[in-house]
């Protein structure tokens, strides 16, 4: 019985957040058995805009595509990069909810005019203005989410994101850990990531703002990867053989980039098991999402009724998964090296 108490104590101490001795105000949501029994190395974490918005809620550009385009447009106007008529045209398109990918593409082209063989870098300036000083804008509950992601990463999970920001990399650096940002322009590194040779790398499938030339909004922008059969085979094997865990993603599976990379080759697979954590919110919308995702092998799981429920839920899930993964690893090690290895500390689940 003593070991059970010790395990519970370890789990409660996992990251140091929400460990003030206060009893929980409501009964925590149960963890789905088929998810909590996964090991970190069996997971690919997919980070969507919902995570970035939770980490730095005061930055409108992190909340949605529309928010990002508006922020870029505002920066372009502030820097006198657009004529009045041009800015009005872009504002009108945003207001009318025109195709946002096309609007973003046109704005990027406008901010990156090519003269002879030289392309200006005004787009880069606008990006840096939009994402300026993200470190100071992170909130504690958001940092807890990033800490959970980083913990799973260090224990073998792969991470990809649809976001342009580098919040996870910034948080890791603050913890004294170095993560690499990858985009689809570097086929060699993408291949190595898919082969699990670059586990401490974050794959940004739309690019990352620190490398504007790697930003792509449509599959046409990374034909080099789509035409590389070796890279595509390794990428799609991940979706077939691992469990993707979607965090803050909503309708990410409708993203044309994500579909081209992962879904095209596995449309008719029936043995996929992926997971999506979402807020329950509107019951009808939740049911609709759950039904739609099941067709793609994705189980939609509610972490609670409020966005604020996610950090604590994901912390518990992370510790459960890490504990099982670490225990299995130490059991194997113990068989080889004697029983003492099996009694080592589970890193991250104790102080």
Swiss-Prot record:
<comment type="function">
    <text>May play a role in Cajal bodies formation.</text>
</comment>
<feature type="region of interest" description="Disordered">
    <location>
        <begin position="1"/>
        <end position="32"/>
    </location>
</feature>
<keyword id="KW-0597">Phosphoprotein</keyword>
<feature type="modified residue" description="N6-acetyllysine">
    <location>
        <position position="11"/>
    </location>
</feature>
<feature type="modified residue" description="Phosphoserine">
    <location>
        <position position="9"/>
    </location>
</feature>
<dbReference type="Pfam" id="PF13289">
    <property type="entry name" value="SIR2_2"/>
</dbReference>
<dbReference type="InterPro" id="IPR038916">
    <property type="entry name" value="FAM118"/>
</dbReference>
<comment type="similarity">
    <text>Belongs to the FAM118 family.</text>
</comment>
<feature type="region of interest" description="Disordered">
    <location>
        <begin position="330"/>
        <end position="351"/>
    </location>
</feature>
<protein>
    <recommendedName>
        <fullName>Protein FAM118B</fullName>
    </recommendedName>
</protein>
<feature type="modified residue" description="N-acetylalanine">
    <location>
        <position position="2"/>
    </location>
</feature>
<keyword id="KW-0007">Acetylation</keyword>
<dbReference type="GO" id="GO:0015030">
    <property type="term" value="C:Cajal body"/>
</dbReference>
<keyword id="KW-0539">Nucleus</keyword>
<dbReference type="GO" id="GO:0042802">
    <property type="term" value="F:identical protein binding"/>
</dbReference>
């Amino acid at each position: 019985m003593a070991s059970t108490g010790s395990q519970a104590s370890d789990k409660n101490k996992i990251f140091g957040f929400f460990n003030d001795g206060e009893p929980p105000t409501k009964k925590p949501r149960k963890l789905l058995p088929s998810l909590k029994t996964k090991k970190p190395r069996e997971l690919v974490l997919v980070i969507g805009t919902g995570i970035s918005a939770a980490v730095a809620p005061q930055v409108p550009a992190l909340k949605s595509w529309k928010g990002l385009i508006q922020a870029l447009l505002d920066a372009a106007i502030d820097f006198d990069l657009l004529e009045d008529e041009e800015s009005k045209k872009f504002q009108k398109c945003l207001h009318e909810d025109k195709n946002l990918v096309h609007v973003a593409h046109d704005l990027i082209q406008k901010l990156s005019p090519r003269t002879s063989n030289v392309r200006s870098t005004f787009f880069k300036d606008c990006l840096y203005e939009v994402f300026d000083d993200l470190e100071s804008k992170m909130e504690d509950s958001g940092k807890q989410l990033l800490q959970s992601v980083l913990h799973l990463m260090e224990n073998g999970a792969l991470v990809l994101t649809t976001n342009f920001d580098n919040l996870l990399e910034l948080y890791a650096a603050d913890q004294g850990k170095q993560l690499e940002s990858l985009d689809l322009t570097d086929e060699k590194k993408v291949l190595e990531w898919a082969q699990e040779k670059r586990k401490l790398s974050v794959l940004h499938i739309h690019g990352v703002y620190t490398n504007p030339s790697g930003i792509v909004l449509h599959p046409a922008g990374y034909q080099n990867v789509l035409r590389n059969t070796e890279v595509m085979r390794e990428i799609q094997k991940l979706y077939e053989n691992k469990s993707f865990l979607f965090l803050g993603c909503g309708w990410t599976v409708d993203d044309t980039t994500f579909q081209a990379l992962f879904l095209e080759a596995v449309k008719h697979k029936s043995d996929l098991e992926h997971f999506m954590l979402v807020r329950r919110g509107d019951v009808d919308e939740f049911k609709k999402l759950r039904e739609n995702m099941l067709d793609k092998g994705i189980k939609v799981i509610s972490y609670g009724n409020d966005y604020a429920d996610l950090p604590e839920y994901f912390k518990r899930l992370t510790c459960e998964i890490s504990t099982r993964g670490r225990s299995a690893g130490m059991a194997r090690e113990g068989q080889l090296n004697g029983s003492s290895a099996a009694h080592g500390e589970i890193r991250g689940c104790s102080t």
